[in-house]
Design a protein with these regions (language model features):
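Helix N-cap motif at beta-to-alpha junctions
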Residues: 101-105
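Surface-exposed, low-hydrophobicity interaction/linker segments
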Residues: 29-81, 299-303
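Short, flexible, solvent-exposed loop/turn segments with mixed acidic/basic and small polar residues
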Residues: 80-90, 321-324
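An acidic, glycine-/histidine-flanked metal-binding catalytic module
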Residues: 1-34, 38-41, 155-288
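Short Gly/Thr-rich strand-loop-strand
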Residues: 113, 119-151
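Short, mixed-charge low-complexity intrinsically disordered segments
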Residues: 326-373
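A short, charged, amphipathic alpha-helix used as a generic interaction element across diverse proteins
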Residues: 309-325
Length: 382
């Protein structure tokens, strides 16, 4: 690494300073330091991936592993979000995500990693957070553990390893897709309360599903019966109420149309898939994509703008929002092609993952229906 930790720390402060937007020299110097700092993690990340592949094989030979260097946009957001955060101490510049079949395999891998020196401090302690045992307020579930791996010049670099199940991963993928199109920042505890409640309740139901025998043994028919029986049981009225709230939220029609939240989300996922293909084919440069989705016909119109054309894209977006405000048949969104690439990088199988997410939402809807009417019948009988 060409720069000292003091210079890296200063670059972190400068990244979120007011002066950086008006001082070209400061911007250039800061971005140069940031790029070098990020790049110094690349070979350490490769070493971490090699190390993990051997361990993962012992826990789940069908596990999915993805690595990434934290994007500049995400680094800036994190620095702004946490007052005491510094660039030099940010522990997830390099990150690896391991997606395993179920919680049993997640715990098996976690226990294996806990014994490895690369995850232990000099005094033998672990630096980790278990959001599966204690989920975040929004319902996020995963295990984060910090390891130290050497880069190509022998420097130790922090690498964050995230362990989660496929269902936990599908939940996170779907939240990212909603954030991308609605600009709510649910991930940062911002946005509409009804969406926060939806994802929190879904996380609760997913936790129940993951602990059922049918899920652990991948027996779909057994799982469906087990889950419906669980939800409709007389002692689980609160669980049934949560399932009903999820059912009502995703099936309610959007104002002025017969189009549901579920259908809108699926169109978002399909739109993202279409945009991503255009970007990957090199037909769209870095910049912005303006979408107009007709919720009655399912037709999607897209316009691509280069990065320098943001003002034009923003003005058109505002115009469409204003002119279509009274017409509930249209949904308008302005998304960054860079953000689309970010989802692909963090969630390479996002399209398939979103389908898995909604397949389990369908199960929750089915259980809500059966549970509600079973409960009604019980109340009448008593």
């Amino acid at each position: 690494m060409r720069y000292t930790k003091k210079q890296v720390e200063k670059a972190g402060f400068d990244l979120i300073s007011y002066e950086i937007n008006s001082d070209a020299d400061l911007l250039h110097q800061t971005m140069t330091v940031l790029t070098d700092w990020r790049d110094s993690h690349i070979s350490a990340l490769d070493e971490a991936e090699k190390f993990l592949k051997v361990k993962v094989e012992k826990a789940d030979n069908k596990a999915f592993i993805a690595k990434r260097i934290k994007r500049t946009e995400s680094i800036i957001k994190k620095l702004k979000r946490f007052n005491k955060m510094s660039l030099k101490n940010m522990q997830d510049i390099g990150g690896i995500r391991v997606v395993l079949a179920n919680n049993g395999k997640v715990n098996q891998l976690f226990n294996l990693l806990c014994k490895e020196n690369v995850f232990l401090s000099e005094i033998g302690s672990l630096k980790f957070k278990n959001y599966i045992k204690e989920p975040k307020e929004d319902g996020y579930r995963s295990i984060h553990i910090i390891g130290r791996f050497k880069n190509n010049v022998g420097e130790d670099k922090n690498i964050e390893v995230q362990l989660r199940t496929q269902l936990q991963h599908c939940w996170a993928t779907s939240l990212e897709i909603i954030d991308l199109f609605t600009h709510q920042n649910l991930k940062l505890n911002q946005g509409k309360p009804e969406w926060h409640l939806f994802f929190k309740l879904v996380s609760n139901q997913f936790e129940i599903i993951e602990n059922l025998r049918g899920f652990k043994t991948n027996s779909q028919n057994i799982l469906i019966k087990e889950y419906i029986d669980f939800v409709k049981h007389k002692d689980n009225v609160k669980i049934m109420d949560e399932a009903v709230k999820i059912h009502n939220f995703v099936t309610q029609p959007l104002a002025g149309s017969n189009y549901s939240i579920e259908e809108l989300f699926q169109d978002y996922a399909q739109s993202l898939h279409s945009i991503d293909k255009v970007i990957l084919q090199g037909k769209a440069k870095q910049g912005y994509v303006l979408l107009r989705l007709n919720v009655l016909t399912g037709n999607l119109d897209t316009e691509y703008f280069e990065k320098s054309e943001y003002a034009e894209a923003s003005n058109k977006y505002s115009l469409y929002e204003t002119t279509l405000a009274e017409n509930k048949s249209w949904v308008v969104a302005l998304v960054s092609s860079n953000a689309v690439g970010g989802i692909r990088e963090a969630y390479p199988n996002y399209f398939a993952d979103s389908k898995v997410f909604w397949s389990y939402i369908s199960l929750i809807k089915q259980a809500a229906f059966v549970g509600y009417y079973t409960n009604q019948a019980r109340n009448k009988a008593s």
